[in-house]
Amino acid sequence: MQKRTLYQSGKFYKGNLHTHSIRSDGDSEPQDIAQRYREEGYSFLAITDHWIYGVHEELNREDFLVFPGTELDLELPERKDHHLVSIGLPETNRIPDDYRFERERTGNTLCTPQRIIEYMAAHGNVTIYAHPYWSKVDSTDIKNIHGLLGMEIYNHVAEFEDSNGNSETYYDHFLFVRNRTFCFACD
């Protein structure tokens, strides 16, 4: 089998920007997760626990980078949710490790996807809309969101557990309304 990409030459890196540890709903310690991904040949990882910001600088190696990040979610009526993964760069992030967003969560600071995106950008982070099909949102629920780095078009956990990890249709609609937005997949 021949590997093909859009580019014939260049440096290519494999990574995962959406995974959880035992700090939220994952089943492994952050250091064990990082070790498994390194052993599988990944170059980068973001441990994005729910409502807990993780920096994990101690897990970085010369050939492996752990991006700081979190996943924030908002419940909507009719069993729908917005899930947004925010990732920082070590040079730009201004949110401390293990920050729980308690004050922001109870007020109006993080009450809409747009406010989450703006808050995270003001603190040196970019935001990706996570697994819209699994979250049961309608494309109309997300079409007016601005400032996203991209959308997660495939989430393997959602596909494996519930057969609803493929969000290509949402991405297609979002592109039609918003023009350029990157797409991401996670395992």
Regions inferred by a protein language model and the residue ranges of each:
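Short acidic/histidine-rich active-site segments
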Residues: 180-187
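Short, well-ordered beta-to-alpha junction loops that form the rim of enzyme active sites
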Residues: 130-133, 187
